[in-house]
């Protein structure tokens, strides 16, 4: 039985506890953006541009941006560099498919202190609604390290928009606040 003012079950309602945590969450989160690609540069990185645009339009601040090669060691090194800075959330785009060069999940998993499996599950569910069975090819993931958030997203602009608009942006302040409390 839910407490007074809370909704029970999965009706999509927001509990009083979640509402309270959201109200206490930071309104602006400092973010880092890494694009994983062997072919992009800052002038041709449309996915990274979209990530920056969506984050900044939602009131967040991008404090670090870089392009890194599709190489697990390079991805790990760039992620650690970004996380050592003034960001609370690191968003990576690219390298989450099943091609041989797609190594972003393998690069990041050893860095995670805690994985957030619901992110990948929900992202694939939303993707299935938009693109059908091709959603199987996504290995998007999220997790925490040192009180900071990591999100590994596909390189497709449609997938970036879906992930940001439907999952990341609605909860980013809440997630950042909770992650910092537990650090």
Which residues does each PLM region occupy?
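Non-catalytic beta/alpha edge segments that cap or flank active sites
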Residues: 1-183
């Amino acid at each position: 039985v839910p407490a007074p003012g809370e909704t029970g079950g999965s009706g999509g309602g927001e509990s009083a506890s979640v509402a309270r945590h959201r109200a206490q969450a930071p309104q602006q989160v400092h973010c880092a953006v890494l694009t994983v690609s062997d072919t992009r540069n800052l002038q041709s990185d449309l996915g990274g541009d979209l990530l920056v645009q969506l984050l900044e339009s939602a009131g967040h601040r991008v404090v670090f941006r870089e392009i890194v090669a599709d190489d697990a060691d390079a991805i790990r090194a760039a992620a650690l560099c970004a996380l050592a800075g003034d960001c609370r959330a690191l968003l990576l785009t690219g390298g989450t498919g099943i091609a041989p060069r797609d190594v972003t999940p393998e690069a990041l998993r050893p860095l995670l202190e805690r994985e957030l499996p619901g992110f990948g599950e929900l992202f694939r569910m939303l993707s299935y609604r938009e693109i059908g069975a091709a959603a199987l090819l996504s290995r998007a993931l999220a997790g925490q390290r040192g009180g900071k958030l990591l999100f590994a997203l596909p390189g497709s602009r449609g997938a970036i928009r879906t992930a940001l608009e439907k999952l990341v942006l609605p909860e980013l302040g809440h997630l950042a606040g909770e992650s910092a409390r537990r650090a």
